[in-house]
Amino acid sequence: MKALTEIFGKLLEKIRGVDYIDEATLQELSREIQRTLLKADVPLDLVKSFTENAVKRIKEEKPPAGIPPREYLIYVLYEELVKLLGGEQPAEFKPTKKPYIVLLLGVEGSGKTTTAAKLAKYLAKRGYKVGLVETDTIRPAAFDQLRQLAEKIGVPFYGERDGKDAVEIAKRGVQNFKNMDVIIVDTAGRHRNEEALLKEVRAIYDAVSPDEVVLVIDATVGKMAAAQAEAFMKYLPIHSVIITKMDSTARGGGALAAVAKTGAKVKFIGVGEDVDEFEQFSPRKFVARVLGMGDLDTLLEKIKAVFEEEEVLEEIESGRLDLLTFKKQIDSLLKLGPLSKVFQLLPGNLAAKISEEQIELSQRNLKKWRAILSSMTLEELKNPEILNASRIRRIALGAGVAPKDVKEMLTVYENLRKMSKTLRRQLRLRMAK
């Protein structure tokens, strides 16, 4: 993935160097995005649609308050890349019956046999009893390769060194492992245009009725991954895909995008030669790594938290400011850090009405306030006026603070509530004009 990270790193350097995004700058950045995607071997039609979507969003969407345009552009780039590679949610591997039969297929040289062992170890580490079956009668070394890998990872193996009928070997192998949780059946590598071999894998499919058919694709084929997937799909259903050799090429991004275009789900990627260098594919995590941004999750949290604060602001503007709303504010503030952030979002610079001393005190006491609010009942959060001395003592005891700490928090809340009244009056005056 290093090569892929490097080419996207150059793109991010250009974006970070932008202070203001006007039409000319946006067009230049869009061309740079296109060049980057083409270097990653993403199919041209996907490059065009990706760029159009990203540019449209930047033009039409307003960044949340406090988020510089360049940061929001990176956020949009992240979201669109995740969509390009299959969506936010990773496709999980979940055996639904026993035994759960997995049929592996792919072209010769794709790393399919090694992948069979990698998948077996991945599942074994998660508590599944796994059996490996080798049906390749064309490549003599396949039998020894998978048997040795099976011994290395401690997984049972079935194969017939001198076997001639792949279909019969598959049937006997499945029968041999009928008490296993998962049976992984490896097949001979085949070219997508070799009709006889494609018919053979269809015959194996019909004979063992696999619960999942997994296509193994070499990342170095880039955008041609779509053609491979579509060729196999003509003969049997492809339920999921594993992309191998992701560590050795920048074209892996193109392979992932091309596969996503076919509708097949990438479930795993191979990121090295060792049997442990194998991981579940998550578009979100993959994009974060490719962009080389250790703080990407922080950036996403920041933007999402600001959106949450804007929802709180809507509640304030509508007059729905109670302690439950205040609690939502505290939750967002714990993500963002400084309390002054929420007041910066208020229109008309209402933050000036809160003293620096109050803000600094609030920053020191955020966690204490969160504990206090968590000690209140829902009725108390929605109806702060019922908080008498007895209730305050109970809340303080539950939060591990003194009653005066509860009263101090209520004072800050009351100040914010009064500000909301001022805000509503200003809004009504504007509407009356």
UniProtKB/Swiss-Prot annotation:
Keywords from the named record: Cytoplasm, GTP-binding, Hydrolase, Nucleotide-binding, Ribonucleoprotein, RNA-binding, Signal recognition particle
One Gene Ontology MF term: 7S RNA binding
Enzyme class: hydrolase
Domain of life from the UniProt record: Archaea
Cell location: Cytoplasm
SUPFAM superfamilies linked to this entry: Domain of the SRP/SRP receptor G-proteins, P-loop containing nucleoside triphosphate hydrolases, Signal peptide-binding domain
Keyword Cytoplasm carried by entry: yes
UniProt catalytic activity: GTP + H2O = GDP + phosphate + H(+)
PANTHER family named among the record's database cross-references: SIGNAL RECOGNITION PARTICLE 54K PROTEIN SRP54, SIGNAL RECOGNITION PARTICLE SUBUNIT SRP54
Subunit structure: Part of the signal recognition particle protein translocation system, which is composed of SRP and FtsY. Archaeal SRP consists of a 7S RNA molecule of 300 nucleotides and two protein subunits: SRP54 and SRP19.
Role this protein plays: Involved in targeting and insertion of nascent membrane proteins into the cytoplasmic membrane. Binds to the hydrophobic signal sequence of the ribosome-nascent chain (RNC) as it emerges from the ribosomes. The SRP-RNC complex is then targeted to the cytoplasmic membrane where it interacts with the SRP receptor FtsY.
Family the entry assigns: Belongs to the GTP-binding SRP family. SRP54 subfamily.
Protein name: Signal recognition particle 54 kDa protein
Gene: srp54
